[in-house]
């Protein structure tokens, strides 16, 4: 219900997505399309998660850890989008500023994760590897890596909203199978938000999710895979994100070498 109002506000203010000159020609038609739609479904997902968690008596540390990751990475994306749109700086936050925010978020996540008694054991295709402090480095890499991977994938109408819906549905099933109902609540809350957003984001998109949505979704997926001790599954569930990131890295490397 809030999305049409959000779209209308951006159209009224004539604030929308800026398109880089070096981008594909077909991106030019998207110039001026409202963005930051991720803000709407993030707020909705957080409020729904808390409400359902309270209703089902599942306001656990795990639930709040996941909501923290969703909110913090969303704030980083929000600042990036805000600078792009309202400060008229097409690059938003620079890569160093974004990385510092993502790393700080990952460190806080890991410290809270360990303080709640989680063992720091990596599940590698069914084999449990007790990594100790090294697991902290892995967790940091996982959150930062996948938040950026989802962000890089967000370039085609409806793509991340559709892939995200599939990803959170998959982790919802895993959480249900493991009887981790607090994680299930978060998965379903975000899934509902993404399905509602997809109606407006499918081709031709009336609004984009922006970095506020994509960075938050990627960070949350990584955190969920860790909380479920199913880290390796993200390589399958998030295969498109991994492939897109690898493609971008190859293109950048090729460009620098030529």
Residue ranges and their predicted role:
Residues 1-11, 41-75, 109, 132-150, ...:
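Alpha-helical transmembrane segments
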Residues 5-30, 79-93, 249-258:
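Cytosolic, membrane-interface loops and tails of multi-pass inner-membrane proteins
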Residues 19-33, 57-58, 62, 182-184:
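Alpha-helical transmembrane segments and immediately membrane-proximal extracytoplasmic
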Residues 31-42, 96-105, 161:
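Select subsegments of transmembrane alpha-helices in polytopic membrane proteins
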Residues 31-33, 125-135:
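Short aromatic-rich membrane-water interface segments that cap or initiate transmembrane helices
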Residues 37, 81, 211:
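Divalent metal-coordination and catalytic microenvironments
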Residues 57, 85-86, 117-128:
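Membrane-interface helix termini and inter-helical loops of multi-pass transporters
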Residues 58-94, 98-99:
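Hydrophobic alpha-helical hairpins/lids featuring a short glycine-rich hinge
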